[in-house]
Amino acid sequence: MILYKYTADCSKLNLEQEDATKEGYEGLYPRRSDIAEWNSKFYTAYRTEKKFFIMISDIRKDKMTIVAELEMEVDPRECVDYIRKILPEMELLACEEITSDEFYKEMVRTERNNWTECYIRSMKEDLKLATEPEHSYYEPVAYQVSERIYTSQDMNRQKQSEQMQEIMASESFYEEMERIYAPENEKRFVGHPVHYLITAGDKAAADDMIDILIPALLENQRLLSGRAYDVQKMTHKAEREGNFDNIFSGAKGGTVILSLEGEKSTGRYATGNYDLAKALGNKLNEYGNSTLFIFVDISGNRSVSDDTIAEILSNADLIQIQECQGDLKRASAYLKGLAEKTEYHDYTIDELTQYLPKEKKLYSVSDIYNAYNRWYGRGLKTHIYKAYKEKDLIKIELKKKTDKPYLELQKMVGLSDVKKVTDEILAAAKMQKMRKQIGRAHV
C-alpha cells in the first residue's frame, strides 16, 4: 500500500467561492458541490476495481488537495491518468508520499466538508490504516509503532559515501552498499532478494545506518515506497493484536523495522516470546517478497535467545550490518557533526570528547551517542537553563549491605512463621523456574 498526496491547480474548474473576502476556513468552497460528485466517481472506481482509492480533501485559493491509496502492483501513472480523466482541466503541481496517519486526517477533512458518501471509519478498516494496539488500563500496550517517510531525493553515490564516513560505517555496511549499487543489478522492483539484521549498541546508532540504507535502496529502485513502520517494545501479546497484521500488509512496497527488544524471558521456550518470534518468522515468510524487513538487535536489550533469533531468520536470507568502531579522530568528527545540529556553538573538541570511555582507544557509535547525550545534558545547564550553571548534582552515598536480604532475615531473632512462609515462596519460585525451562505452563 502506497499513500500519496497531490497538490493541484484547480483555477480552471470554475468553482465558485461563497465569499471571496473570507479567509481561512471561512474561505472554503461550498460544502456540497461538484466535489462530492467527483469523489463519488472516485469511490465507485475503488469499489469496482480495488486498484486505488482517491479522494479530494481540501480546496483553498485555487489549490486542490487530493489523496490516493494505491496497491503496490499499480503503476502510479495509472492513478494520475484516472484523476485527469475525471478532472481534465486540473493541473497537478506536486506529489509526495505521506504516512497513514496523515492520509486518515485528510479523509476526516473530506468527511467534515461533506464531500464523501462513504463511512470514513469503515474505509479506515477497509484500507487497513489502523496499526495501533488496543490500550488497557491494566496492562502495557502489546507494542509501539511509529511511521516515517524516506526519500531518495538528492541521494547519489557520492553523498551516500560521505554519509557512510560520517557515521563510521563498518566493513559489512560498505560491502552491502557495493552490492546495492552494483551495475549488474537491474533497476526495477520485483521483490526482495535479502532482508537485514542490524546490530548496534544503541537505537540511535542503528537508525543512522537505516537512514542511509533505505534511501540507497530507493535510489536503486529496490523499494517502491519510502514509508517505514518502526515497531518497538513488542511483548508476547503483539501477535494477538488485530491491528498487528495491518503493519505488514500496509507496508507492502515499503519497510517494517522490528526492534528485537521487550520483555525479558527465562529460557528458550519459557514465555510467549518464542511464539512471537515464530509469528514474526511467519510474517517474514508471508510478506517477505513485498515488504522489506529490517530487524534491529540492540546489544543487551534483546528479549529472545539466539536460538529464537535463528527461528525468525530461517525464513529468509539476511544480510547482517554491524556498527563500527573508530579511533579518537573519527569519534571526534562524529561528535562534532552531532553537536553542529544543536543550538550550542561555543564548545571545544575537548568538551565533546571528555565523556568518551577513558579506558578505550577505539570507540563504537554507541559510545559516541552516550558521550553526546551527556554533553548535551550538561549544555542545558550552561546554555539554556543558566541558573543551574554552577549547581552540581547531589551525590547520595548508599551504605553497602554485606548480606543478602534472605540471610539477614535468617539472622533475626524469632519470626519463625515469617521465615517459614519465605522458604515456601522461594521453593515455589524455584519450581516455577524449572517448569519454565522445560516449556511447561506457569503454576
Where are the regions that the model predicts?
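Conserved helix-loop functional segments at active or binding sites
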Residues: 427-435
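Structured alpha-helical bundle/scaffold domains in large eukaryotic membrane-trafficking regulators
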Residues: 347, 421, 434-438
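ATP/nucleotide-binding catalytic cores
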Residues: 2-380
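Conserved small/polar residues in nucleotide/adenosyl-binding loops
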Residues: 441-443
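C-terminal helical "lid" subdomain and adjoining coupling/linker elements of P-loop NTPases
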Residues: 363-413
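Trafficking entry modules
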Residues: 420-421, 425-427
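Contiguous, function-dense segments enriched for cysteine-driven chemistry
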Residues: 183, 413-416
